[in-house]
Amino acid sequence: MGLGRQKWGTDVTKDLAEFARAKNVKYFMISYTDLFGGQRAKLVPAQAIADMQKDGAGFAGFATWLDLTPAHPDMLAVPDASSVIQLPWKPDVAWVAATCVMDDKLVDQAPRNTLKRVIEEAARDGMHVKTGIEAEFFLISPDGSAISDQYDTASKPCYDQQAVMRRYDVIAEICDHMLELGWGPYQNDHEDANGQFEMNWTFDHALATADKHSFFKFMVKSIAEKHGLRATFMPKPFQGLTGNGCHAHISVWDETGKTNVFADKSEELGLSAKGKNFLGGIMKHASALAAITNPTVNSYKRINAPRTISGATWAPNTVTWTGNNRTHMVRVPGPGRFELRLPDGAANPYLLQAVIIAAGLDGIRSKADPGKRYDIDMYQLGHTVTDAPKLPLNLLDALREFDNDKSLKTALGEEFSSAYLKLKQQEWNSYASHFTQWERDHTLDI
């Protein structure tokens, strides 16, 4: 394979052509994720995969959400064989995540490259981050106008036994595939909104979690389509219903990967001093973090939502942390880990992990204090809290917070940060210039 792939950080020990022969794979989807979380791929016949593993598949980067122009040369997506997954529902095809390269250099703004760079930075400090995610989704009608199950109408539908069994064929098929892939899925449930579901699998190293997260979204959408449905991870697809979160569970392990350095039963909530410093970094950068964990205009309809039909939004709106209490931005459910409840379903799988690690690493290095612990119901008593910062009210506020957070931008890389801010500002400008019926209703006769 040559040394080139080693310097790009891709796996040169696994021969994809041999993988194809052994698994009867006819095609490979060489896939990368752009800055907006869009999954881009080329379908490559197995006969050509050896050349692709050597040289990469060519893409016009400008045609996707990257800060490139038509004048840029081809961007090469070099498959990282360590990520290859044979599609359980279409076994003659395999999916493989790619490393984006241009002019024999890494494309620094590419999300997976950004994550790998941050992971390497943490590893230099002897830290290996392991994470798990809870990617909620709705099963809706093909045209996106309504939930797909006309009988799913309960005002409190969470854990609804009848509703989850009416979608047994879809949920069980996805779970069967995760079992086949060795992900260790351990529970599936109907979530707090009508038509909403969550499926959980075992935590892993941050890059593996991001690759699985990316593939999970592809798989869920594919299986839903197979059953004549549509799956959406949109943060707030229906007014009045609970939105789609993507909660992240975080722990840090030593160089061996066997000792959880966040775990200390002698400390408050079983979270070590290093764990509290990592948490301190999350709290310190929270408002800037939102630009990436909550990356769309619609995201702020979730974290700043009024009371939903079920009685709670299950989303934070203040920068606060607590013990086993789901009304805050961060929950410490038990020793050795914490849950960040801020991210939503639109979060880019790679950037979500990258920004968590970057903020936490800064917290450890600066010995950041997470601040006061709140043990109140923020949904009922949040109005009494006057000393906790509020999360951004909209995407523009979040982008401004991110732009002003110099240390976080540096940690994620100047090229990435500049590209992300530029394209997201364009997205906000497009939204802000959109004329709405609300404006007519409230202004026509003024």
Predicted regions and their residues:
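Glycine-rich, acidic/polar active-site loops that bind/position phosphate-bearing ligands
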Residues: G2-I446
